[in-house]
């Protein structure tokens, strides 16, 4: 046992220049932990609440001084004296202090900062890497990365409706080689886009954000880049998409408005469109294919292609075990996206991953579009042997920080390190 002696929060900036929360935790025996909290752009309406000040005179109303004060004035006095190694008790106390179902009182950004910083302090005191502290001796699987190399939707200022077009280097023997393959495809894509006279500026997550003729053209230019880099689509590298369809779903008409293509689709038409893309291209994963409240649409999509494509629930499940349990019961999707700030504590995050695995669902540990240099999610991915991680493109230090941490972890693990690649998709029949 080692008691927490000090907790301190401050306002910092994230990768979009918006304020976020940083928390430091100190223990009586010299343990120290620091954590920085991320922020999303396309957020699910059922996510835990990110507390913002609303004071238009500071940071356009996006300040987080209220959340910082909640850590320093409310949470800290209650947790001083707690055993830093008792993560469950720490998180449970903060949930109790908040007292709301969605952490609206104290803010998920306040609670999560303390939760992660406490884990870092505990690991530091024991002299252990965070992934070992969180996952034990069997934490050894490096995640297959989903690399977002074309950004659209809410993550870019372009005409592409779908939010993310990603590559997954499943044919690599190690994480290090997977990262190299992804970087080479990324650079090849820049060359392809430049050759087409298209913009090669990057979006929030480091991917390119060109104006394209259609969502399908994003797929074809990536396939060209994969081949240009010397790899085989559908063998060395597969594709994944985060459609983020809630962002273009019109509740008043019940239709999906693909403004970039001038199309208005019913749920059934959208599902048929996905099925056509999957038949035509090596797409292995689709995230949030239907609106977060269109559960009938998600069921239709799952029944149609769920046997051969990973269908990831992000806004659908919001890292929430009650939402996930409902999805499992109804046979909706087959994977969950794990975002620590959607739920707000490490214990609840780990509960969601465990529930998914027990049900035969995969779990994809994920960043947010507003990120920091914090690389905790890299350790979480290995600690839980999640098998997959989604942490942006091959540019922007806020994204690369996670990849570099995974390289360090792979080195530390040495010969016991595993990289499952295509085997990460263990619930598909493709």
Swiss-Prot record:
Its main location: cytoplasm. One of its GO terms (cellular component) is extracellular region. The active site is at 205 (proton donor), 339 (proton acceptor). GO terms for molecular function: magnesium ion binding; phosphopyruvate hydratase activity. Binds a second Mg(2+) ion via substrate during catalysis. Keywords: Cytoplasm, Glycolysis, Lyase, Magnesium, Metal-binding, Secreted. (2R)-2-phosphoglycerate binds at residues 163, 339, 368-369, 390. It is found in: Cytoplasm; Secreted; Cell surface. The gene is eno. Signal peptide: none annotated. InterPro entries: Enolase (IPR000941), Enolase-like_C_sf (IPR036849), Enolase-like_N (IPR029017), Enolase_C (IPR020810), Enolase_CS (IPR020809), Enolase_N (IPR020811). NCBIfam families: eno (TIGR01060). One of its GO terms (biological process) is glycolytic process. PANTHER family: ENOLASE. The keyword Magnesium applies. The keyword Secreted applies. Its cofactor is Mg(2+). It catalyses: (2R)-2-phosphoglycerate = phosphoenolpyruvate + H2O. This is Enolase. Pathway: Carbohydrate degradation; glycolysis; pyruvate from D-glyceraldehyde 3-phosphate: step 4/5. Mg(2+) binds at residues 242, 287, 314. Catalyzes the reversible conversion of 2-phosphoglycerate (2-PG) into phosphoenolpyruvate (PEP). It is essential for the degradation of carbohydrates via glycolysis. Belongs to the enolase family.
């Amino acid at each position: 046992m080692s008691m927490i002696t000090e907790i301190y929060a401050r306002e910092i900036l994230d990768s979009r220049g918006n304020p976020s929360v940083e928390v430091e935790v100190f223990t009586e025996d010299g343990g120290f932990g620091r954590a920085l909290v991320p922020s999303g752009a396309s957020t699910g309406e059922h996510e835990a609440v990110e507390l913002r000040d609303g004071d238009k005179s500071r940071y356009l109303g996006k300040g987080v001084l209220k959340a910082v004060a909640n850590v320093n004035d409310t949470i800290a006095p209650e947790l001083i004296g707690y055993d830093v190694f008792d993560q469950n008790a720490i998180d449970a106390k903060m949930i109790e202090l908040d007292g709301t179902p969605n952490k609206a009182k104290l803010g998920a950004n306040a609670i999560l900062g303390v939760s992660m910083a406490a884990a870092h302090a505990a690991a530091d005191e024991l002299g252990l890497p965070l992934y070992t502290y969180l996952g034990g001796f069997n934490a050894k699987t490096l995640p297959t990365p989903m690399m977002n190399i074309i950004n659209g939707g809410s993550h870019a200022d372009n005409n592409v409706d779908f939010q993310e077009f990603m590559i997954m280097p499943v044919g690599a023997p190690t994480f290090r080689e997977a990262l190299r393959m992804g970087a080479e495809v990324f650079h090849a894509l820049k060359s392809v886009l430049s050759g087409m006279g298209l913009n090669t500026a990057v979006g929030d997550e480091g991917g390119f954000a060109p104006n394209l003729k259609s969502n399908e053209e994003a797929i074809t230019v990536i396939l060209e880049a994969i081949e240009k880099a010397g790899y085989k689509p559908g063998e060395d590298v597969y594709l994944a998409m985060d459609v983020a369809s809630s962002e273009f779903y019109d509740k008043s008409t019940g239709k999906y408005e693909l403004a970039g293509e001038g199309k208005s689709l019913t749920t059934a038409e959208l599902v048929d469109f996905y099925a056509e893309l999957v038949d035509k291209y090596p797409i292995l994963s689709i995230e949030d294919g239907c609106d977060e409240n269109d559960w009938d649409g998600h069921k239709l999509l799952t029944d149609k292609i769920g046997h051969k494509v990973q269908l990831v629930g992000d806004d659908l499940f919001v890292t929430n075990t009650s939402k996930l349990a409902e999805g499992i019961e109804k046979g909706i999707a087959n994977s969950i996206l794990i975002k620590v700030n959607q739920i707000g504590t490490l214990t609840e995050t780990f509960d969601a991953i465990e529930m998914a695995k027990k049900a035969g669902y995969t779990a994809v540990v994920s960043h947010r579009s507003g990120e920091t240099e914090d690389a905790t999610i890299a350790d979480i991915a290995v600690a839980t042997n999640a098998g997959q991680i989604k942490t942006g493109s091959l540019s922007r230090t806020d994204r690369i920080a996670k990849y570099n941490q995974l390289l360090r972890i792979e080195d530390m693990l040495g010969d016991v390190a595993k990289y499952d690649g295509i085997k990460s998709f263990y619930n598909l029949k493709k």
